[in-house]
């Protein structure tokens, strides 16, 4: 995330906070607890490395709700996350972590840049999930890294790189099953991880239509099935409705799981 100079503060409880960082989709603020940060989810939408910009009404609150629900659920499955609580519908309290400057992308079906770079046909089901690493650097355009390049750049060591891959594949298994129960296909998605004060790697950032490519199983049309930020990228329209559909299905599935497992 890009660092910005302090701007007008906001108030959380009785504590006044200066903005720490602002990224494309979220703003981070400190809290009274140095181990806790407040994330504000924005309605801003960007694509193509911020070359295309716009607003999606209500996106911040929708993405916050979806992410919170999925983080809570993943915690019950033994996946550590940075989630703590949501004080408001577009705000999330999270554990402070040192973000590893890698975007970890898992692909189940050929789409997006994978098709452009390889010539694979969109919609091709991959024989095995593909894990890719992208260097988080806006100036370089977040380039795709090989395993060896990631080690060469020193962004992490080999043991942690393997941990990131293993965690991503584990999360993918859980999310694929979850979204299938929502009648949605998880095509691909992006994850970010960070290390806490003890050095433990935990899942951070968000899981939402901004970071996942999601297709509606009830729609055969290749445009109508899109339920994610591709609607913004490709000017497909009905962006808010698509995000709302994902939110409704995710929260309904969470309610079903809670009725079976108890509250989480």
From Swiss-Prot:
It comes from the Bacteria. It catalyses: 5-amino-1-(5-phospho-D-ribosyl)imidazole-4-carboxylate + L-aspartate + ATP = (2S)-2-[5-amino-1-(5-phospho-beta-D-ribosyl)imidazole-4-carboxamido]succinate + ADP + phosphate + 2 H(+). GO terms for biological process: 'de novo' IMP biosynthetic process; cobalamin biosynthetic process. CDD domains: SAICAR_synt_PurC. Pathway: Purine metabolism; IMP biosynthesis via de novo pathway; 5-amino-1-(5-phospho-D-ribosyl)imidazole-4-carboxamide from 5-amino-1-(5-phospho-D-ribosyl)imidazole-4-carboxylate: step 1/2. One of its GO terms (molecular function) is ATP binding. InterPro entries: SAICAR_synt/ADE2_N (IPR028923), SAICAR_synt_PurC (IPR033934), SAICAR_synth (IPR001636), SAICAR_synthetase (IPR050089), SAICAR_synthetase_CS (IPR018236). Keywords: ATP-binding, Ligase, Nucleotide-binding, Purine biosynthesis. Transmembrane segments: none annotated. It is an enzyme of class 6 (ligase). Its EC number is 6.3.2.6. The keyword Ligase applies. Belongs to the SAICAR synthetase family. This is Phosphoribosylaminoimidazole-succinocarboxamide synthase. It comes from Synechocystis sp. (strain ATCC 27184 / PCC 6803 / Kazusa). The lineage of its organism: Bacteria, Bacillati, Cyanobacteriota, Cyanophyceae, Synechococcales.
